[in-house]
């Protein structure tokens, strides 16, 4: 049951990774920001915006398969939040990724790649048994094709992003614990908003420099 649940939420995981996909690529020019010494370049930003656009296109084309009529609007709204087309919002996402990537006690890149590969392998293993898993596999295949990449390259490119995602979840869990919050379907959006406000406060304490471009 645990594994089935993990697979059913895989699309959400992929959205997170697509929003963080290119933070590992480095360049020495056209900086848009630095986060605790980590550079974010214009090249990264443009590639990120391209990735966001492709992923939104793929997800939107499968929206009837992955969301009930009642949840279509919510799903598309979250997709816009995770894969922004707006330049400033995309920079903010990359800044958050760099911040989380620099946290202590992170999992290793090897472990990140192993976990991503396991989730993709799970899609193959269960796509014949569950329709939602089959759709997720189709989404990933289409995503790879439109970005002209392979599954193997995606795993490597996404390792840093996955590490950042894991660290973000750790911070979220600690926030809930420290605030003694009980999260359910009735207050989940409210709690997420509270966490985002808390995260903004933490980012203000970081060494972040933005460059005009």
Language-model regions: role of each:
Residues 15-19, 94, 166-170:
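Alpha-helical transmembrane segments
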């Amino acid at each position: 049951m645990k594994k089935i649940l993990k697979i059913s939420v895989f699309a959400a995981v992929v959205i997170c990774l697509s929003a963080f996909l290119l933070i590992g690529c480095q360049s020495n020019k056209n900086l848009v920001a630095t986060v605790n010494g980590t550079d974010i370049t214009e090249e990264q930003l443009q590639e990120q915006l391209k990735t966001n656009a492709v992923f939104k296109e793929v997800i939107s084309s499968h929206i009837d398969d992955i969301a009930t009529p009642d949840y279509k609007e919510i799903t598309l709204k979250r997709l816009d939040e995770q894969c922004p087309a707006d330049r400033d919002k995309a920079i903010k996402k990359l800044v958050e990724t760099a911040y989380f990537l620099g946290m202590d006690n992170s999992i290793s890149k090897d472990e990140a790649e192993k976990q991503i590969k396991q989730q993709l392998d799970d899609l193959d293993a269960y796509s014949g048994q569950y329709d939602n898993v089959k759709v997720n596999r189709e989404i990933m295949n289409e995503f790879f094709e439109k970005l002209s990449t392979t599954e193997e390259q995606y795993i490597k490119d996404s390792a840093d992003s996955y590490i950042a995602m894991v660290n973000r979840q750790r911070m979220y869990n600690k926030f809930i614990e420290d605030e003694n919050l009980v999260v359910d379907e009735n207050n989940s959006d409210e709690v997420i908003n509270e966490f985002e406000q808390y995260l903004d406060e933490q980012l203000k304490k970081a060494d972040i420099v933005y460059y005009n471009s």
